[in-house]
């Protein structure tokens, strides 16, 4: 699935949001030793996988900021609004937590992708795609903190996507692999997963196609982009 242009827009939206929110506040003396939670390190297994080789992983329930949409992400204004809403709210939550003594690193963007017809992906009929873009947050973020951050973000941006929410994602047993290269080159790896690995292992689909975008497309050549591909499964 070719989403390189989308990833570029992700980077641009991130910069716009950071400018809208303002810089990370200057550290006060008591903040110098404040521990900063990095979920990529704390939950390392979720962000790592063998290159081009799917392995089973049990994914625990995880808290995410989420936003939904439908259609071609490269053309849909809704997609850019979703990203702006997610990043603005994620940074708003982060700064609020930091002011109370609990800082964290904003996690990489993730996406859930689906379509009524799986061939929509291989045929690149992007107008048929359904997507949910997500940013993982610490599990101590509650609904009240989210709603407060949402209000602040809306004041900054003027408008947020209506589907923005805090939700727990439960995937359970998954198969996960690392793809290095252009998003357009994921096809053969996905075909092997769907046509060989899952049938031979007695697995059926247990959830939506899940991608975790580890690379910064502004600084990374397309052939070196790192994407974790995750597929929730169930035993048939």
Q: What label would you give each PLM region?
A:
Residues 1-2, 34:
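Accessible peptide chain termini
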Residues 10, 17-19:
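Short terminal hydrophobic/aromatic SLiMs and anchors at protein ends
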Residues 2-4, 24:
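Intrinsic-disorder-associated, low-complexity terminal segments enriched in Asp/Asn/His/Tyr and depleted
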């Amino acid at each position: 699935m070719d989403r390189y242009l989308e990833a570029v827009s992700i980077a641009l939206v991130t910069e716009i949001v950071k400018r809208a929110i303002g810089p990370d506040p200057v550290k006060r003396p008591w903040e110098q030793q404040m521990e900063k939670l990095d979920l990529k390190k704390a939950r390392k297994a979720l962000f790592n996988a063998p290159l081009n080789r799917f392995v089973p992983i049990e994914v625990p329930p995880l808290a995410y900021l989420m936003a939904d949409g439908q259609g071609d992400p490269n053309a849909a204004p809704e997609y850019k609004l979703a990203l702006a809403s997610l990043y603005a709210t994620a940074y708003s939550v982060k700064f609020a937590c930091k002011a109370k003594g609990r800082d964290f690193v904003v996690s990489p963007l993730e996406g859930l992708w689906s379509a009524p017809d799986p061939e929509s992906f291989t045929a690149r009929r992007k107008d048929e795609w359904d997507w949910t873009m997500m940013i993982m947050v610490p599990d101590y973020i509650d609904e009240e903190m989210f709603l407060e951050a949402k209000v602040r973000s809306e004041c900054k941006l003027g408008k947020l996507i209506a589907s923005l929410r805090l939700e727990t994602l439960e995937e359970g047993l998954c198969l996960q692999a690392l793809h290095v290269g252009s998003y357009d080159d994921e096809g053969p790896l996905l075909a092997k997963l769907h046509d060989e690995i899952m049938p031979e292992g007695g697995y059926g689909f247990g959830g939506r196609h899940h991608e975790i975008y580890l690379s910064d497309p502004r600084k990374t050549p397309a052939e070196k982009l790192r994407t974790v591909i995750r597929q929730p499964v169930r035993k048939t």
